[in-house]
């Protein structure tokens, strides 16, 4: 990513980037979690058409229905797993992006190429999926389950979800849907980081906007929309497959085929609006906070170094 416009602030270190990415991602997750819960509920709806339960309509309608029938706190069901996911996953995939990009471009004296940026996004996206997958499985299942009186929840809490999954599905149950999540996160990581990076760089270099909050907002919002559009079909299949009981879908492709046959192509874009609202707002909050936090941490470090 392009360097900060404030010349007196030293470039952020790798640890500062990782810490800033983790903290920013956690903040973004806390703020946007109800939207993510609405997205998951809309995506799994239709999986079992005859099952008893509330029917959800639209983003705000889903949020209102969950809050009314299950209580407002249910919108944050699975938040501990979500925070754990951001700490173990987002901190590394975003925090290491610049470092990996610099590694791929080490033999050149010119700025990083588009190929370098894509390669960095691919690598950080792939590696961190395996680290964060258990938290993703627990998060999705906690968000998908309803606590209405006629539906017995599968899990009493996030840590109970980890325990029950290992007990009933084996240790590898925590990595269910890894191949799908790998595909999804490679798409998300490359699109989000590369679009943000390229657009931000273009805006600054062409003197359209300074390297500050308005520039970060525009670049992040554009990256969020592009990411949602490309990742939505994989995201829906991933959510359905991860949330399904053992044996319900023999394979990932069986889940996708079942959706296509029973619900049509539109099923692959279920929850698109909440996906964009969530991913778009998450991307904006994360990147704007990330950019500012990096600067402030380096300023603080510079002040401490000067004082000593």
UniProtKB/Swiss-Prot annotation:
It is found in: Mitochondrion inner membrane. One of its GO terms (molecular function) is purine ribonucleotide binding. GO terms for biological process: adaptive thermogenesis; cellular response to fatty acid; cellular response to hormone stimulus; cellular response to reactive oxygen species; mitochondrial transmembrane transport; proton transmembrane transport; regulation of reactive oxygen species biosynthetic process; response to nutrient levels. It catalyses: H(+)(in) = H(+)(out). May undergo sulfenylation upon cold exposure. May increase the sensitivity of UCP1 thermogenic function to the activation by noradrenaline probably through structural effects. May undergo ubiquitin-mediated proteasomal degradation. Residues 34-74, 135-179, 234-267 are mitochondrial matrix. The chain crosses the membrane at residues 11-33, 75-97, 118-134, 180-196, 214-233, 268-290. Residues 1-10, 98-117, 197-213, 291-308 are mitochondrial intermembrane. Keywords: Ion channel, Ion transport, Membrane, Mitochondrion, Mitochondrion inner membrane, Oxidation, Repeat, Transmembrane, Transmembrane helix, Transport. Solcar repeats lie at residues 11-103, 112-202, 211-296. It comes from the Eukaryota. The modification Cysteine sulfenic acid (-SOH) is found at residue 255. Brown adipose tissue. Fatty acid 16:0 binds at residues 57, 270. Most probably functions as a monomer. Binds one purine nucleotide per monomer. However, has also been suggested to function as a homodimer or a homotetramer. Tightly associates with cardiolipin in the mitochondrion inner membrane; may stabilize and regulate its activity. Belongs to the mitochondrial carrier (TC 2.A.29) family. Mitochondrial protein responsible for thermogenic respiration, a specialized capacity of brown adipose tissue and beige fat that participates in non-shivering adaptive thermogenesis to temperature and diet variations and more generally to the regulation of energy balance. Functions as a long-chain fatty acid/LCFA and proton symporter, simultaneously transporting one LCFA and one proton through the inner mitochondrial membrane. However, LCFAs remaining associated with the transporter via their hydrophobic tails, it results in an apparent transport of protons activated by LCFAs. This is Mitochondrial brown fat uncoupling protein 1.
